[in-house]
């Protein structure tokens, strides 16, 4: 009887998402412009923090979240005098791969990205 209770308790626990902490190499295309930041992410519970190295002089801070296999993070980047918020929303395919969509607001443009854990 104790085994059955223990199994039922274990089965009722939520599935834990993989930890996305680490360095991720992102490759994508948004409005025909390639994007290739290297993002250093830190997951604490369901929250993501860190930074994305966009170029040699720019590594904006990121914020985001993880819910099961769904991963979202964003940062601000200036391009031709306009500040855009790039938001990455993807699915953790494995411990080393995220695939999804990136959007740039306020332009309402989007594209696809793949991130590989280094």
Predicted regions, residues:
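Positively charged n-region of N-terminal signal peptides that target proteins for export
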Residues: 1-4
């Amino acid at each position: 009887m104790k085994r059955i209770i223990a199994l039922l308790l274990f089965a009722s626990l939520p599935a834990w998402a993989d930890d996305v902490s680490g360095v991720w190499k992102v490759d994508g295309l948004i409005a025909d412009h390639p994007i290739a930041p290297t993002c250093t992410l830190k997951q604490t519970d369901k929250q993501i923090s860190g930074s994305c190295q966009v170029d040699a002089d720019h590594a904006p801070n990121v914020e985001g979240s993880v819910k099961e296999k769904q991963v979202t993070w964003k940062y601000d980047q200036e391009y031709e005098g306009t500040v855009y918020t790039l938001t990455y929303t993807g699915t953790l395919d494995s411990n080393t791969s995220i695939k999804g969509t990136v959007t740039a607001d306020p332009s309402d443009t989007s594209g696809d990205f793949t991130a590989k854990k280094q």
